[in-house]
Amino acid sequence: MHAKITTDRGTMTVEFFEKDAPNTVANFIKLAKDGFYDGLKFHRVIPGFVAQGGCPHGIGNGGPGYSIDCELDGDNQYHDLGVLSMAHAGRNTGGSQFFIVHSREATAHLDRNHTCFGKVTEGLDIVTQIAQGDTFSVKVFED
């Protein structure tokens, strides 16, 4: 299974870490299929760090109305360029907000603290072009 994230800057293809973060991937896919992400904004963009989205209010304080547990023990729990990872307000408080990593150098401290659940495999150049306030949508495809 993979997804296409269409932004104001272009489209990125994402492959999921289903083996390493099965519950997080299932949650993201469910939200995407339900249309939860359609038209939401990247509300937090810090160049050289991350582009974060998934808040239904567009300001970083909202979610889907529930929390999911972190999954931090898999092999792919390293915040490299293009990795998708769950944002949270503390361990096991993630829901819908996620971020896309801009740089390994600035995000190594997030390893095994935030669940990495996928990686951009096409359109990697778009990751660093995303601007705060840009909108996005997610479409999931069966492999």
Regions found by a protein language model. Give the residues of each.
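Cyclophilin-like peptidyl-prolyl cis-trans isomerases
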Residues: 1-143
